[in-house]
Amino acid sequence: MAPKKKGQKMALHEFFEEAATSGTSWADDDFDLPTAPAAREESGSGLKRGDPGYFESLPDRGSRQATFAGAPVQREELPLPTVPPFTAFIGNLSFEPDVEDEVRAFFNDLDPVSVRIVKDPQGKPKGFGYAEFKTQDGLKQALDRSMSQLQGRTIRVNVAEAPSTSRHPPSAAEEASQWRRSTPLASRESSSQPSRRTGGPSEPAADLDWSVARGAKFTPSAPAAPLSGVRRDSSGPGHTREPRDPGVSDTADQWRSNKPLAEKVDRDVPPHQAGVAPPIVSPSLADTEQTWSRGTKLRTPTTTSRQSSADSTPSSGAPQERRKLNLKPRTAGSPSATANATPAAPASGIFGAAKPIDSAAREKAAEEKLAQREGERRKAREEAEKQKAAAGDKPVEGEKLGWREEKLRSIKAAQDKVAGKPTTAPATTTNTGAGRKGSADRAKKDEQGFEQVQPSRKSSQTGATSENKPKKDYSTRPQFSFAAAAGAIRNDLVEDKDEEEVTKGVEEVKI
């Protein structure tokens, strides 16, 4: 084991002095310090962002992008066109509605052909447009006016880019100015380009009259002659397909017929079926139908039933004879025919044996029934009145008058009973208004306003014993008022004819 080396001792200030004089550092050998970015050129205007006119003081986009590192490559200026149209692109225009007139007036001395300002769907300018000039010199002078002021904005004028051209030439539809063509478009096989399906040029197709196809009928052209050099093998590039015979649809003369096209009988058959007669197939319902409009029903052909009936009859060598008719006189009836005749079965309906209801007849029957009941009631009422008249009953008006008279008599009887006078028998005759008299027959009133009782004529004819009796003094002790009793009875509408009940009602009246 080697002996361990001892470190040399040195003062601290000597160590720092040696490191300062050497000028090297271990960090310089391991890391690369980043460099500071290039200083940006200050604009000469001295305006800051946000100040009015700041964006107008900035240089053009091309020069501004080249001032910082990593900027995209500046757009190359387009060369001047040598053939018309000589169009210039005008950018950084104002958004005022009259910007087109201002641009036209700006280039008026250059005699512009047209000025077009691009607008949005709402009709507002987008801030750029195009101006077309007659000559190349006019376009050069327009380019010299770039970075000029127009409506307070610095406009830019450049050469307009030509419209982009695709790899493929424009089609016939793009070049056509009239979209409603009277002849069909040129077929793809007739062009100079090779066909993608066959790999080589093909012969042009026959020119057809397409104007006839717009009518009701389609007139096909004559079948083209078979192509020369057609081989059976059509596979591979450079080979064409074998022409086929015209089908049923090619030879149809009526294209608006509702009936389906009939198939061609002599169509191509497989080799293993060549020379074999086709099977006889009876026509179906669809083959025998003449009308193919929607909603019609297929009718069963009648020829099948006739043929079946003809086949069912046995054939014999001898000719058939007509059966002899047995005629009978017209006067004689045919009982056998009537006996054998069966009644026809009623047609079955969705409602069965139900019949419609005659509402008018039912209403009439109900009215007749009500009228009959009303007549019976009226008749019974008349019979009841007749029975009352026969039994001696009084009419209705007489009954009302008798009730009033009986009421007055009951009141008078009650007054006589209270006064102590004998009651008289009620008269049998009807009152003809004798109860209503003048003011002289009315009862007199005393000092307190009570009516005084006066004896009636019938009570004055009684004996002298009743006249000699002393009269009661009603002024000292008034206890009863006949007028109040009569008023109470009238208000209560007493209809009782019994004298005792009336008297009881009068006695209950108190003053």
Swiss-Prot record:
Q: Phosphoserine (modified residue): where?
A: S334
**What is the top-level taxon of the source organism?**
Eukaryota
UniProt KW Protein biosynthesis keyword: yes
> What GO cellular component is one of the record's annotations?
nucleolus
Record's keyword annotation contains NADP: no
Q: Provide a Gene Ontology MF annotation, just one.
A: translation initiation factor activity
- Residues in RRM domain copies: 86-162
Bias category Polar residues: which stretches? Answer: 179-196, 285-318, 451-467
Cited SMART domains: RRM (SM00360)
Q: Bias category Low complexity: which stretches?
A: 331-349, 420-434
Reported function: Probable translation initiation factor.
Recorded protein name is: Probable eukaryotic translation initiation factor 4H
This protein's encoding gene:
TIF3
